Amino acid sequence: MKSALHTVIMATNDDNGNPVTCAVDIMDYDENGLYFLTAKGKNFYSRLKKNGYLSLTGINGEDTMSRVAVTVCGKVKEVGSECLKRLLDKNSYMYEIYPTECSRSALTVFYIYKGNGEWFDLSKKPIERYSFSFGSEDLKEVGYFITDKCNA
């Protein structure tokens, strides 16, 4: 997912329960989850710490009928700076955004460790759609019933 969907839109809730979105780059993934960065002074950081949950959607493709969309909803944990250097080295453009040790000291790493998701691929015929879960989360099937011969 990271290579196909690097920049995603993440949503958290503010203090009033309203959704707030922001664009975030997925820095890496492994068997533990998806890793991303934020600065400790941002409102996004405060919402992650308070709620511990987010939703993200990433889209890849040239036009509507060639697009793949992935949505993930899950729990997040702060890892801190323990793997920050590895993530920055893997995504070296981040050194241009945060060029000094001082500026990088504001960064912290989070990972999405448990959740559900959906893969939706309009480039395939018939359209490919499936649900997945990770981090020992129970699978939540998506879709709906239309008729015995048609499900979406």
Pin down the residues of each PLM region.
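Short His-Asn-centered micro-motif
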Residues: L37-A39, I59
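A short, well-structured catalytic beta-strand-centered motif of the EAL phosphodiesterase domain
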Residues: V24-D28
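Residue-level signal for well-ordered, solvent-exposed loop/turn and beta-edge residues enriched
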Residues: N16-N18, K75
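Short active-site oxyanion
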Residues: E31-Y35
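Short, surface-exposed beta-strand-loop junctions and turns on beta-sheet-rich folds
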Residues: K42-F44, D63, K125-I127
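A short, Trp-centered hydrophobic/proline-enriched beta-strand micro-motif
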Residues: M1-N16, L54-G58
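C-terminal edge-of-domain segments
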Residues: E101-A152
